[in-house]
């Protein structure tokens, strides 16, 4: 028996994933350079890195926005390497930086939630709204503490950016995904709203133990949240910390690692 085996099953496996955009053209850019990453059930990994480090590209690869040039991606035991976004919808939920991208314009709060409840199946409103489901929606919205549970009939176009982002979060986890990816989902919000959405995120992720990958530029969030921290640079995983090593991190130590990565790049070039 392997006493060092992880007590939780592997949910996400990224192996040797590479991606180059505009290959052979003037704007050629290497987005991912042989990324290896494993997340177990309940892991909450925070991803940091400078602009162009590959953070959002990694999330896009996991979500299915493109097929990698090389490597493999497995989610909940299923090889999804070549599956497009809609074929991963039952496994991966995503919240974008732009609050407008996570909800369907022109529909009410309730109608958006009804669509989210059918994630991974046919997204239709037919027979989607009932008293029982309305109760589910109210219970899902109440913990946000911003009154959306009283605005089920409100068109989402009338919501503020923060309210819409909070709704996007609830929609993403209404049907628990295998993996939740958060791409700087608080970056476009004012500080007060960002704190509320982040608190709701942490509460929801912890309560359901959802395996989560969150990109942020907020160093304090990177230190305070999650059980793992990953730093990316030039499309690679430059540094990783978990457990006591993560708890010991400080903002100055992270800044120092950023500088070290840049210095290594300068030496290579």
Summary of predicted features, one role per range:
Residues 216-217:
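H-loop/switch region of ABC-family ATPase nucleotide-binding domains
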Residues 7-11, 20-34, 84:
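A short, flexible loop at the N-terminus of ABC-type nucleotide-binding domains that lies
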Residues 48-50:
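The feature captures the beta-strand-to-loop junction immediately N-terminal to the Walker
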Residues 63:
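Helix-to-loop junction immediately C-terminal to a conserved catalytic motif
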